[in-house]
Swiss-Prot record:
Gene3D superfamilies: Ribosomal protein L17 (3.90.1030.10). Part of the 50S ribosomal subunit. Contacts protein L32. PROSITE patterns: RIBOSOMAL_L17. GO terms for biological process: translation. It comes from Herminiimonas arsenicoxydans. HAMAP family: Ribosomal_bL17 (MF_01368). This is Large ribosomal subunit protein bL17. The keyword Ligase does not apply. One of its GO terms (cellular component) is cytosolic large ribosomal subunit. GO terms for molecular function: structural constituent of ribosome.
């Protein structure tokens, strides 16, 4: 019996799927929030949560494992310097997936996936159109 071996196929070849998930992981770590389809967001959660858990323990072995999965030196540094300490007291559940309705072109279910406890970037935008 199969019983949950592997990832969702997402209608892609194995190499395309792994490259897409790696790129989405790096994008999520860089921007801390991205918009994607709901099945991709659910699959991304299964990929990125163990990587964030690696970032909680700062060791050479964990850095090598993270680089092996991310292939982006800048994101490995951010993972261990910023994200690891941020989630030191949290045992899993580092992400939030919010449903956003459906895409206009193909009616695909869309989702907003973001890291929890991210710093607020509330910048007031001045309206100069009235002058």
């Amino acid at each position: 019996m199969r019983h949950r071996h592997g990832l969702r196929k997402l209608n892609r070849t194995s190499s395309h799927r792994l490259a897409m998930l790696r790129n989405m992981t790096v994008s999520l770590l860089r921007h801390e929030a991205i918009k994607t389809t709901l099945p991709k967001a659910k699959e991304l959660r299964r990929v990125i949560e163990p990587i964030l858990t690696l970032g909680k323990t700062d060791s050479l072995a964990n850095k090598r494992l993270a680089f092996n999965r991310l292939r982006d030196r800048e994101m490995v540094v951010k993972l261990f310097a910023e994200l690891g300490p941020r989630y030191a007291n949290r045992n899993g559940g580092y992400l939030r997936i919010l449903k956003m309705g459906f895409r206009a072109g193909d009616n695909a279910p869309m989702a907003f996936i973001e890291l929890l406890d991210r710093p607020e970037t509330t910048e007031a935008v001045e309206d100069n159109s009235g002058e």
